[in-house]
Regions:
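Glycine-rich phosphate-binding loops that contact phosphosugars or nucleotide phosphates
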Residues: 1-104, 140, 176, 181-183, ...
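A conserved, hydrophobic alpha-helical segment in the catalytic core
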Residues: 77-87, 241-252
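Structured C-terminal subdomain patch of bacterial secreted/periplasmic proteins
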Residues: 222-248, 254-255
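Short, well-ordered loop/turn and helix-capping segments at boundaries between secondary-structure elements
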Residues: 90, 160, 190, 206, ...
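Alpha-helix N-cap/helix-start and coil->helix boundary motif
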Residues: 46, 143-144, 247
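Active-site phosphate/pyrophosphate-binding segments
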Residues: 55-183, 258-287
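Extended hydrophobic-aromatic, low-complexity segments
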Residues: 145-149, 162-164, 173-174, 194-198, ...
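Composition- and surface-driven signal marking solvent-exposed, interaction-prone regions
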Residues: 150, 198-200, 243, 266-267
Length: 287
């Protein structure tokens, strides 16, 4: 529907790691026909997005590391988007944005190491504490998208239902069906979205839920059964680059505990993979 508002004054950014997601490629073609400036972010030189997009950006990322699909490409995509944002910012602010971005990226490997033991414990907790599902992941502002991404990791590699929701909306919707044995992740850097997410967390702890807290607030971390402490210096704006890591790792260890292969998603099911291609790449062949 948004394509109707695109014209020659518009800038459109398309993202597809394979470069072959049919709807993304269609949107790029339509936007370019309407005269828009289109940037395509992809990790494939042979995909259709790189071929049809007037301004492709190739990430050039190597093969994924051996834990949880879509971790390296997700971080790489976010980094590219932040770089684009910095490039579009006021010249007086650009250098400061790029310095903060570089500092945050330098923290990624440290956070991966720092979160390993806690993520392993959290993943095992799902099994030994008899948790019910779905897994709920709550965030607000920029970190609503982080919550949605975290839910995707549990869906893809653990085969359990997971729901990423905006913190306020959760209070009006999913809360009415949540079981106190459902695990809840709170993605909550200090900033504009923090206070409401913390209030929701306090209520859920009172309700009896186990909280898995990802935050740079000691007060909120103190409320969690499991707490992933994030760097104080990283601002809310840049938090998505780091705050996805604990969920990636927890999903990885939970998947292994279930006896699954976290490196494979559900692609080891040939029929499911076939239908997935029908859904996303326009290959509708029912034979």
């Amino acid at each position: 529907y948004g394509i109707r508002q695109v014209d020659k004054e518009s800038t459109v950014i398309a993202v597809s790691m394979s470069g072959n997601v049919a709807r993304t490629v269609e949107a790029v073609k339509e936007a370019q026909e309407r005269g828009a400036y289109v940037v395509g972010i992809t990790n494939s030189l042979t995909g259709r997005l790189y071929e049809v997009c007037s301004h492709p950006v190739f990430l050039g990322l190597e093969e994924e590391p051996g834990w949880t699909p879509g971790t390296l490409t997700y971080t790489g995509t976010l980094y590219a988007l932040y770089c684009l944002g910095a490039g579009l910012s006021r010249e007086s602010e650009r250098d400061g944005c790029l310095r903060k971005l570089a500092f945050t990226m330098e923290q990624v490997s440290r956070i991966v190491t720092q979160c390993q033991d806690m993520a392993r414990q959290a993943g095992e907790n799902f099994v030994y504490n008899g948790h019910q599902f779905p897994v709920y992941i709550l965030g607000a502002g920029q970190n609503f998208a982080t919550a949605k991404y975290g839910a995707a990791k549990f869906l893809e590699v653990c085969g359990v239902i997971a729901i990423g929701q905006e913190s306020e909306e959760f209070a009006h919707q999913e809360f009415w069906v949540i079981d106190k044995n459902c695990p809840v992740f709170l993605v909550a850097p200090k900033g504009d979205s923090f206070q409401r997410t913390m209030e929701v967390g306090e209520c859920l702890r009172h309700f009896g839920c186990d909280l898995f807290v990802i935050s740079n607030s000691e007060e909120l971390c103190g409320m969690g059964k499991y707490a992933f402490r994030m760097p104080e210096e990283v601002e809310e704006l840049y938090a998505p680059l780091l705050y996805a890591v604990p969920m990636q790792l927890t999903a990885y260890y939970f998947s292994r505990k279930l006896g699954l292969d976290p490196d494979r998603r559900s692609h080891n099911d040939p029929f499911r993979k076939k239908v997935s291609r029908m859904l996303t790449r326009g290959t509708v062949n029912l034979d």
